[in-house]
Amino acid sequence: MTLIDSHRPEIASKHVVARDFGAASDSYDCAARLQRHMGERLLAQLPRTLSASKVLDLGCGTGQFVPALSERYPQARVTGVDLSAAMVAHARRQRAGDYQWLVADAERLPLASGSVDAVFSNLMIQWCTDPRPVLAECLRVLRPGGMLVCSTLVQGTLRELAAAWQQVDPGVDHVNRFEAWPALLEQVMAVAPQAAVEQETVTLPYESPMQLLAELKSLGAQYKGGARRKTVTAPGRLRRLAQQYPRRDGEVLASYEAAYITYRRQD
């Protein structure tokens, strides 16, 4: 048995993912601290010297990084791609500029092979059942010499929140589970053996667990597993969560285990 087969996290359907993120389009940018941090690091991995006439932001959401990609490659046509039509509509309204927008499934991009110079994908593939088809599709559309930079989350993300919930509501999942680091490495190497993969722990402070939960909802990143409760969480359960969540210097901390993938297609 491969690492990939062991304890695969349950992922919501594409419809649920698109619905949740679309519903969060108006609140997303104000809450997207992690997305900004990871996206800026990802952007820095794209060399300005790359000759680029066509750039994709895959899983663009509200189009937060589309202007930055355009500034980095002023001669390029930048296209924001997202599964959520609501997100793409929001991005089109909010981002003034000569950009293109596309509603599409990352596993089946309506683009010619070898037609793109750079693919930028920030915090998208963790919502895929299996990242390998998406990575393979990214490599398919890359031109020789083109680059893929991609970020995702791995196991251990929001571990403080998960531990607190298990004290309050044992045996019930409340936090999304992500692929283990060794499994992600195996998946990436299966598609792109020359890729570089790096890991970073990002820790963000919050005033309370309630602020953390509100931020996740504002991002459309609330728990998506099939076992989630179908009713509103009782106030008493939330109070117990606040009591169980560890505090440091009056605030609570949330850890995110980030992974960054960089690949350059050989000429």
Question: What are the functions of these language-model segments?
Answer:
Residues 118-130:
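A short SAM/SAH-binding and catalytic strip from SAM-dependent methyltransferases
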Residues 33-52, 68:
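Conserved alpha-helix/loop element of class I SAM-dependent methyltransferases that forms part
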